[in-house]
Amino acid sequence: MTTEHIEELNDQQIIRREKMAALAEQGIDPFGKRFERTANSAQLKEKYNDKDKEELNELNETAIIAGRLMTKRGKGKVGFAHIQDREGQIQIYVRKDAVGEENYEIFKKADLGDFLGIEGEIMRTDMGELSIKATHLTHLSKALRPLPEKFHGLTDVETIYRKRYLDLISNRESFERFVTRSKIISEIRRYLDGQGFLEVETPVLHNEAGGAAARPFITHHNAQNIDMVLRIATELHLKRLIVGGMERVYEIGRIFRNEGMDATHNPEFTSIEVYQAYADFQDIMDLTEGIIQHAAVSVNGDGPVNYQGTEIKINEPFKRVHMVDAIKEITGVDFWQDMSFEEAAALAQEKKVPLEKHFTEVGHVINAFFEEFVEETLIQPTFVYGHPVAVSPLAKKNPEDPRFTDRFELFIMTKEYANAFTELNDPIDQLSRFEAQAKAKELGDDEATGIDYDFVEALEYGMPPTGGLGIGIDRLVMLLTDVTTIRDVLLFPTMK
């Protein structure tokens, strides 16, 4: 360690380093070694919470725990402290005459943030708090920096996101939210595995962006001397696996989109995509409802979800409505009628709906109407289906009205949570859709994709009728944990 670095340290950091050196002089490794526990805080509370002081004295049972020192009080020959492990906190009671003078010195000199191992007897204090009366302490790791805001947790938002480890130490609600996130993902896996789906892994580096309308991150492969993109979706590779005969596949993984950031968008996020052979979008609606409800039950039980004061009836059948019907109900505009792009654009001008310069089809106008007037009204879980072909380059046309596709999106609290459709498996139609996307890209649509000829070739070998689905995991976790910003469900959100 350089002299320059030491001079930059504050008083607390200097004192902690001196204590570290003192431990080493006593033959104690300041950063410890393997330590075997017999229980954690939650297990002890579950086992002994119904026992009073006298019962615990009669039982005379012991335990070995370990964790971070979060509070410490007392003076002279007696002290109390709280030790925090993954499951929570438990109090320890330390007496000099019980642990010995040398062992008690370890406790006295321990700083908040240090890790300790404690062996002792299970007891209840006169105040009624379940505790461990220490018979031996082991120093496990020295914290060289003090913890933030000792009693009130971490409150600075910038620090919470940049230094998530400090947030997890000091904010139990935040810690539990990320435990819940893991449980949600595990339950989704369990549900799909139970339905006969196979979890697979596909490449993160792609030669061509595809499977979604989004701007990609571009990188370079030095050995091959080619530009590549980070995936904006897993769709096209997963559908290749359907061609290969896997029939039911899903992937949970990171997606990368070089776009703006807001309360519900992060450039790097987690999605799940699911593909089922011999199914259509109606089957996938049922599957989506099952996934969402199963995840909700694992967190909130079999009932509605409360999100920001609104009761979301996630436990009831989801509403289903065609996009055109939803627009007509709110605006009175009937897009079931045949009309030219110019006529549709005139309706948009009349209703003050902004149109992008690359819009060339009636379907673009229909989608713009939906985004302008309908999305903000969708509070309860609602499947909106029948998207126009112009905005659904990978979805199969509806056989009864080829202007529209067998596609749906799930909306809850005005936000999209899932996107799905009967997959386009006609390679000729697929190529023409790719060509239309390439043209839109030339006209200035940054989110339009190029032509994936290899995927078209795969379809030429034959893909069975297939239903596909994508769900944003982060938004789902936000809903089920009642938070309003995606940064609160990402352990390490993107920061400047």
Curated annotation (Swiss-Prot):
State the needed cofactors, names only. Mg(2+)
Per the record, the GO terms for biological process are: lysyl-tRNA aminoacylation
List of residues binding Mg(2+) 2: E416
Pfam families on file: tRNA-synt_2 (PF00152), tRNA_anti-codon (PF01336)
Keyword Nucleotide-binding listed? The answer is yes
What is the cofactor note?
Binds 3 Mg(2+) ions per subunit.
Q: Which domain of life, per UniProt?
A: Bacteria
Catalytic reaction(s) noted: tRNA(Lys) + L-lysine + ATP = L-lysyl-tRNA(Lys) + AMP + diphosphate
Chain sites annotated for binding Mg(2+) 1: E409, E416
| Record-listed E.C. numbers | 6.1.1.6
GO cellular component terms, A-Z: cytosol
Q: Which PROSITE patterns match?
A: AA_TRNA_LIGASE_II
Keywords, A to Z, come to: Aminoacyl-tRNA synthetase, ATP-binding, Cytoplasm, Ligase, Magnesium, Metal-binding, Nucleotide-binding, Protein biosynthesis
Listed Gene3D superfamilies: Bira Bifunctional Protein, Domain 2, Nucleic acid-binding proteins
Compartments (UniProt record): Cytoplasm
Could you describe the subunit structure of this protein? Homodimer.
The text of the family note is: Belongs to the class-II aminoacyl-tRNA synthetase family.
Cross-referenced PANTHER family: LYSINE--TRNA LIGASE, CHLOROPLASTIC_MITOCHONDRIAL, LYSYL-TRNA SYNTHETASE
This protein is called Lysine--tRNA ligase
